[in-house]
Amino acid sequence: IAVGLSSKVLPHNFNELCDAAVHYLKGEPFTIYPDFPTGGAIDVGKYNDGQRGGVLKVRAKIDKLDNKTLVITEIPFSKTTGSLIDSITKAVEKGKIKARKIEDVTSANVEILVHLAPGTSSDKTMDALYAFSDCEINISPNCCVIEDNKPCFLTVSDVLRHSVDRTMGLLRKELMLRKGELEEQLFFSSLERIFIEERIYKERKFEQSKSQDEVVAFIASKLEPFKDKLFTAVVDGKGKVEYAFHREITREDILKLLEIKMQRILKYNKDKADDLLLKIEAELSEIENDLAHMTDVTINWFEYLKTKYGKAHPRRTEIRNFDTIEVTKVVEANQKLYINRQEGFVGTGLKKDELVCNCSDLDDIIVFYKDGKFKVTKVADKIFVGKNILHVQVF
């Protein structure tokens, strides 16, 4: 619809979603956080439950292989090994990270080796990778959905609640569908029982009927007395159930009775028929109980899903608080600062003038004047700071 209405809902952990669904159904509070198949780590301090305006910090997993090598084994969500290596390479080319070589030895699992330049601190380089490459990225979720034909912004918890309510509705529909099937089965089994036990098929009028319409009318008349009657099914003197027709008898029902073959009629067993009716009625009672306790049914459903599939979906992304990295402390001094005292200029581009010190393009510099005043400014290629300079250094 529009750029601001694009939806970005991040993946979450299967087990945690099942647990959250159960908590919601029980009326308990719950919190869910993203979980990525690529692993890594996340800082959820500003996630804001996935709502628009929130920010999720995502980091790669970097370990020390030895004093001269760092290894990246998990990458941020939405990044590939290729795009991650490209971002590191660009940072190296700009002098922000000191690395001798970047090697991709990924096979079944991610493995990117960062070989450090001689004399480089591995801890400082690790922080620099987070600060200047895609080893750390920010993802801005935007849970925009269509509700009542209008776009609206929800939290992921809201989406979960809607989803759980919909699941309950689907489970109810499944139970109602099965109930209808069983009622039809019970209905026709009862018709069949009457048709055979009352020997309607042996009646003279049945045998002498000249048309199908006459047969149908005759059978309908014989079934009429049973319409409002309670039937009883008993097996071995133990199980007992009473039931009645749940709907009117139609022409199609009678035509279906006429399709019963004589061999089946001859093999008809009343005890087996009663046993079937008892089983149907027992399942119907169970369904009625489930329909009256849909919350418990839905809880059992999510617990079943977790038990069956949960082991295959462990959490892969670690949740923790990230330390703030000050980029000026981890960036390499990749520039040289010069000063032209006579004209009052300082900068990295004044290569013919007086060398002050090494610096990075992210540093601030402080300039002291002979009258006791001072000035702080950013490193630039060439910037006028004024004459009567006493001293200049990185701030």
Regions found by a protein language model. Name each.
Residues 1-395:
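C-terminal interaction appendages of subunits in large macromolecular complexes
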